[in-house]
A protein has these predicted regions:
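Catalytic histidine neighborhood in serine/cysteine hydrolases
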Residues: 218-241
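Acidic catalytic loop of the alpha/beta-hydrolase fold
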Residues: 211-216
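Conserved alpha/beta-hydrolase catalytic His-Asp/Glu region
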Residues: 126-129, 141-199
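Flexible "cap/lid" loop of the alpha/beta hydrolase fold
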Residues: 100-108, 113-145
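Catalytic histidine-centered segment of alpha/beta-hydrolase-like enzymes
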Residues: 238-251
Length: 262
């Protein structure tokens, strides 16, 4: 079921809900420059046993572009979706930008989540200067330059992304992401830093990192695992979009983690 929902700012978010009506809920949050379609392997594997909620992050897919966004805004969109769907509590899984969103939610809204999964992310991703520069470049020149090199960051060199349908679909979603939506997310990430707060996360936390990830590294994952009390760390032989490159392994790790909590 596809739903267009309003957030607290009156802007529209594109949401999809599948699975049994009264099952436990798991929410998936996409990475920068993608849309909710990136989770289709996980949705297919889990929708028989969970009520699965995916959504296009603001400025991506079919969701509205919202200017002057922050990490708090990205996270509060999730709370607005839960409230709109009358979901009291859920499991949450985010990758990259969705992963740091998970951290913020774990810090500020632990009562709304059974657990968070932080995939291919960090408590501080890249640098403020780097993100601001990228935002300005995209606004001036569009996304073509980003699209041309994105496979080198998203996928391992040995992964045949060219002949992988979902990988190609995900790259295509980057080409259709609004430049302003992408830039606003870059600006939000420029100021997103929860390093001083993640020790306060009190709910079970799964950290998944890609062995070959040049963006959010194994060291980033190890640092988070040391700081977050109830956390587990798994390293997957993949790059930045590990849920696509190693979809079965990713889903297996996530499912096992959730089953231990249920």
């Amino acid at each position: 079921m596809k739903i267009m929902m309003s957030n607290r700012q009156g802007k529209t978010l594109a949401v999809t809900v599948t699975g049994p009506e009264h099952a436990d809920v798991i929410v998936f949050s996409n990475s920068l420059g993608t849309d909710q379609g990136m989770w289709q392997s996980q949705v297919a594997a889990l929708e028989q046993q969970f009520k699965v909620v995916t959504y296009d992050t603001r400025g991506h897919g079919q969701s509205d572009v919202i200017e002057q966004s922050s990490l708090q805004n990205l996270a509060e969109d999730v709370i607005d979706i839960l409230d709109g769907l009358k979901i009291a509590k859920a499991y949450f899984c985010g990758i990259s930008m969705g992963g740091i969103t998970a951290l913020w939610l774990g810090i500020h809204y632990p009562e709304r989540f059974y657990s968070i999964t932080v995939a291919n992310s960090a408590a501080k991703i890249w640098t403020e200067e780097g993100w601001i520069s990228r935002a300005n470049t995209v606004l001036e020149n569009g996304l073509a330059e980003i699209v041309a090199t994105t496979h080198t960051r998203w996928f391992s060199h040995q992964f045949d992304y060219f002949n992988h349908a979902l990988a190609q679909q995900t790259i295509q979603s980057l080409t259709t992401t609004p430049a302003l939506g992408y830039a606003e997310s870059c600006r939000a990430l420029a100021h997103a830093d929860v390093r001083d707060e993640i020790e306060n996360i009190s709910i079970p936390t799964l950290i998944i990192v890609g062995q070959n990830d040049p963006v959010t590294t194994v060291a980033d994952g190890e640092w988070m695992q040391q700081k977050i009390p109830l956390s587990e760390l798994f390293v997957i032989d993949a790059s930045h979009l590990s849920n696509i490159e190693q979809s079965e392994k990713f889903t297996q790790i996530l499912s096992h983690f959730i089953l231990k909590i249920q």
